[in-house]
């Protein structure tokens, strides 16, 4: 199973001057409410949103997605 690496996303976004969910939303076009749910760990992005994050910050998708054991994901 794969999950959004929230720590890495925050780090990369901050390095691009995006220190808030609002700023991430503006850069990526992902709805602000979705970004805040991702940052709180309440939701996971679908492939489309994950690709938007990667493209907006010019990074490999694997930088913001991490593999987690299936038991930990439940």
Q: Where are the model-predicted features located?
A:
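DNA major-groove recognition helix of helix-turn-helix/homeodomain DNA-binding modules
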Residues: 48-63
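A short, Lys/Arg-rich alpha-helix, primarily the initiator
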Residues: 1-23, 62
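Short, charged recognition helix plus adjacent turn
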Residues: 1-3, 37, 55, 65-74
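Short alpha-helical DNA-recognition segment
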Residues: 17-37
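Short polybasic/polar patches that bind polyanions
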Residues: 14, 26, 55
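Residue-level signal for the short linker/turn that defines the boundary of a DNA-recognition helix
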Residues: 18-20, 45-48
